[in-house]
Amino acid sequence: MWLIAPTTETVQSFFQGKDRTGRNPQVPILTASIVVAWIFAKSITNAANLGRSFGLMGGLAYAVYYMGIPICGLLIIRIRRTTGARSLVEYISWIYGSGAAKFFMAVILVRLYNEVWSNTAVVGSYFGQPGSQSFVLSSLVFTGLVLFYTLKGGLRASLVTDLIQFGLLLLAVLLTLLWVVPQAPGLSLAPMKSGFWNSGIDLLLVALIQCIPYAFHDPVLTDRAFLSGAKTTYRAYLLAGIIGASLIVLFSFVGMAARFVGGNAAVDAPVQAAAAGGAGILALMLCVMMLSGGSTLDSTFSSTSKAVVLDLKVGWQPVLTGRISMIAMAILGNLPMLLGTNILKATTVSGTMILGLAPIFLSLSREQRPQGAFFAPVGLSVVLGAVSAIKPDLLPWKIGSGENASLLAWNVVTIALVWVVFGLFVWQGKKSQNKMTRR
């Protein structure tokens, strides 16, 4: 990747992904970049684990998150056309004020931070147990290798290498399936437990609630919607959503195969399947994880540099400051590996916590709104999401009887409340504006 990644020194290439002639990214490279940036190493692992537990429904439930990609692309095109905003941070600053924009930036930076350790941890798990020397060392080496080529060209380097990684990822996933699935002739698409709610339907409903706000809190995805023209952007986002969802469903078959072949069910499904398949499948699985994790990491580093330099306006030498911010994120993002794996769960931003972004981006506006219309729903969802993770029993009822019955109930309550408080603040703002107009 070091040889393929271009070296750039201009703001247009380093932060906006333009080529040497000044052209914006076209459909093929933009589509490939979106797909591999959103097929995280952790996503592939989750897809396989859900396939092991819930069969085909598990894969479909996780694939629903990828519906957020084309919807996100379409909504950002509307933002660009109606307001002329050059980023989501700029849009929020115009409509809800600078305080709201800074809070949104904090959410983005936490997300980018989480992307580092959540992907390096998956790669490290193929070299040793969490917390072991081999686990930590492999995670750090992997981070360093990705950082090395991303420093050369920023977003342009990320886009170019993503195209190569996309082709290799497709090949690796197909070879993995061709190797694993035939070893499980009795593979079942059904869930492990019988019953409607045990089929994973509750998880699918949670994904439907979360898919749009989840997409909008990921700068790796949203940044790319500002790089090219409207037609190119929507075509790329539509194709990426279809391809990404398809890959997730396909990889859930690895989990179904892992359930059939048996082995240590306490480990992640890809590791379980790899252990049963021998050295060959282990090497293939490691390739899949390194390709998906690497593409996400380089996108994370380039989005970090853009957030620091263009959104926060830090530094006087943009490209140099961008490179320094990448190095800082690489170091900080791997601290959980050095401090112990328990901190990973404590720092994860759950999908419930960002449900407050749903009304912000589904109810677009050209006019200024009260800051409370941003802080109330977003703050409420952060609080409820944290409570649901720490004390899920505080909500006295559940929806259904499946494993995710409590999670579904928390999400239904949270999404309803954030829309209510958002509507109240918007209504109050219009009411106050009308009074001032009459005077």
Task: Spell out what each predicted region is.
Residues 24-35, 67-68, 97-111, 142, ...:
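Select transmembrane alpha-helical segments in multipass membrane proteins
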Residues 1-3, 373-439:
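A generic transmembrane alpha-helix motif of multi-pass inner-membrane proteins
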Residues 60-150, 210, 289-299, 317-319:
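Helix-loop-helix module between adjacent transmembrane segments
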Residues 98-102, 306-345, 350-351:
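Loop-to-transmembrane helix boundary motifs in multi-pass membrane proteins
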Residues 17-84, 209, 221, 226-263, ...:
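Membrane-interface helix-loop-helix modules in multi-pass membrane proteins
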Residues 85-93, 153-162, 217-246, 263-271, ...:
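Hydrophobic, small-residue-rich membrane helices and short re-entrant helix-turn-helix hairpins
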